[in-house]
Amino acid sequence: MGAARLLPNLTLCLQLLILCCQTQGENHPSPNFNQYVRDQGAMTDQLSRRQIREYQLYSRTSGKHVQVTGRRISATAEDGNKFAKLIVETDTFGSRVRIKGAESEKYICMNKRGKLIGKPSGKSKDCVFTEIVLENNYTAFQNARHEGWFMAFTRQGRPRQASRSRQNQREAHFIKRLYQGQLPFPNHAEKQKQFEFVGSAPTRRTKRTRRPQPLT
C-alpha cells in the first residue's frame, strides 16, 4: 500500500521537474552564430597567422593599376610597374585586409577627410579595408573606420573623395591581377624597334655525290 501511495507523488514530481526545465530553456534563447561571426570579423585577429598575398589592383575607371609611390596613391600605373605590386595582409579571419606597396613599403590609408594617403605603419584602423565581392565580379574596398567610404579613383587615376563614393559606382570597382614583373620592353620606343638580323656570307650548297652501284 505504501508503494502504491508514493507512485502518484513521484509521477507528479517528475512532471514538475520536466516543466521547470522547459521553462528555463525558453528563457534562454539559442546563441546567434551569425552575430558572433560579425562581431569577431570586426576585431583584429592577434592569434591566427596572417595570410599574405601579392597582386595588382586594376581600376575600372582609369584602366590602369593602383600604385603607391610614397604618400601619394593613384591609379595610373601600367601593368608590371614596380609601384603597382601590392602586398595584401589579412587583418581578421573575415575579409578585412591591409594593403601595402611592395616597392615603397607604405600602407594605403584613409584620413578623416576621406583622402587616400600612404603611411609607413598600417596598425591604425584607417589602414584597414573590407573586401566586398560584387555581383559583377569586381571587388570594392570599404574603409573599416569610416563605414560607407570606399577606395575610388577618377578616370584620370586621381583618388576620389571617399565621402562621395558608393559601392555601386564604377570608380570603386577593381579587379585583382597577378603581378608578373616588368614587361620585356620597358618603353614604347624600344617596343617599336625592329629586330636586327646578323649578316653573314651566303653558303653554297654542295652537290651530293652518290656511290657507284656494284655490277651484278
Curated annotation (Swiss-Prot):
Q: Which family does it belong to?
A: Belongs to the heparin-binding growth factors family.
Q: What is the lineage of its organism?
A: Eukaryota, Metazoa, Chordata, Craniata, Vertebrata
Pfam families (UniProt xref): FGF
> Superkingdom, according to UniProt?
Eukaryota
Entry-listed glycosylation sites: 137
Q: How does it assemble?
A: Interacts with FGFR3 and FGFR4.
Its source organism is Homo sapiens
Specify residue ranges for compositional bias: Basic residues. 204-216
Q: Which disease is it linked to?
A: Hypogonadotropic hypogonadism 20 with or without anosmia: A disorder characterized by absent or incomplete sexual maturation by the age of 18 years, in conjunction with low levels of circulating gonadotropins and testosterone and no other abnormalities of the hypothalamic-pituitary axis. In some cases, it is associated with non-reproductive phenotypes, such as anosmia, cleft palate, and sensorineural hearing loss. Anosmia or hyposmia is related to the absence or hypoplasia of the olfactory bulbs and tracts.
Q: Where is this region: Disordered?
A: 190-216
Listed A to Z, the keywords are:
Developmental protein, Disease variant, Glycoprotein, Growth factor, Hypogonadotropic hypogonadism, Kallmann syndrome, Secreted, Signal
Provide the GO biological process annotations.
cell-cell signaling; fibroblast growth factor receptor signaling pathway; nervous system development; neurogenesis; positive regulation of cell population proliferation; positive regulation of MAPK cascade; regulation of cell migration; signal transduction
Under what name is this protein listed?
Answer: Fibroblast growth factor 17
- Which residues are the signal sequence here? 1-22
Compartment annotation: Secreted
Q: Name one GO cellular component term.
A: cytoplasm
Q: What does this protein do?
A: Plays an important role in the regulation of embryonic development and as signaling molecule in the induction and patterning of the embryonic brain. Required for normal brain development.
InterPro entries documented for this protein = Fibroblast_GF_fam, IL1/FGF
A single GO molecular-function term is: type 2 fibroblast growth factor receptor binding
- The gene designation is FGF17
The main location class comes to secreted
What is the tissue specificity? Preferentially expressed in the embryonic brain.
